[in-house]
Amino acid sequence: KLTGSENSVVGVTVLLAVLVLRQADFGIKTTHGLLSIAGIFGILIAGPRLSNMLSPIPAFFVNVFCIMLLMILGCHNVIMYNHSTFVLGYLLLQGYDVSGHAYLLRVEGLLAGMVICMAIFYKNQKNRPYRRTFLDLFREFDLSSARNRWYVKLTFIVSSAMLVMSLLGLPRAMWAGIACMSVCLPFTDDCMGRAEKRGLFNIVGSLVFVALYLILPESMYPYIGMIGGIGVGYSAGYAWQTAFN
């Protein structure tokens, strides 16, 4: 309510980040991890708004830049699958764009969320010893690394999917990006299984959405996205995460 019904996606984004940052780390010193969180939220504030102000081709390059930075800042520890939170947040904010006063409220909500995430992250990770620093995230970028090739692959696949959707004049291009992101895994052998589950549970999710749409009063429609976000955050397996997405 503080940020308005148009910004319910901010609550989803912050909630997912909190759920991840309770346990996940960035593979660098904890205090430097706070810089990563600041960078991530800075991208979430500026990137989606900027890409929506541009035509499809320039927006593609903005998306490439922002998603690549999110990968570098938040996904150094591949096993944590942090991209499924931070890139997802970027895509949701990009798809549910706002302007004017609503955007100012969005910025305030994301800044408040950033502070909450920093506090939780520092409290839970402050005693973990790490040798890597914030700058090492950039120094260690090397295209001969499987991790960094995955960064590039996911960035261009997601951005290209949204570009194609935009050029075709189709709404909510971010859904194509989310679909591609969810099956573009760091371990290639896992991709096929993900693709099969996504098809089936997309149908399940659609049926759940229809049920909620029919059952809930119209005043609750803006919060269906938040309900889905909570479902994603508490789903242990990919199949049900897909359904709630």
PLM regions and their residue ranges:
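Alpha-helical transmembrane segments and their membrane-interface boundaries
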Residues: K1-G231, S235-N245
